[in-house]
Amino acid sequence: AIDVYHVWFDPGLDVQVARAGMAGRILAFHVSDWRVPTRDLLLDRAMMGDGAIDIPRIRGRVEDAGYDGLIEVEIFSQHDWWRRDAEEVLTIVAERFRTAV
């Protein structure tokens, strides 16, 4: 899986995504955003469009590498999104998926 939260800062990301694509090894694509500043390295992911990650650029590289599967939204957010009403979160996820992914 290519999880933008774990790889967005890697200067060699484009090369490695292309390499993985040539080998047919991209099996999943996960999106969230990196909150600045972050409060927890694992459980403070931001909603797409609210952080530092250029998700559309990375998505373009992943698709250029041949991936055309599902995109999984992973908002692990104990301080924010997990505390909100589920319908509100789903509405925002859908809107942000259209505008920030």
Predicted regions and their residues:
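Histidine-acidic metal/acid-base catalytic patches
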Residues: 1-101
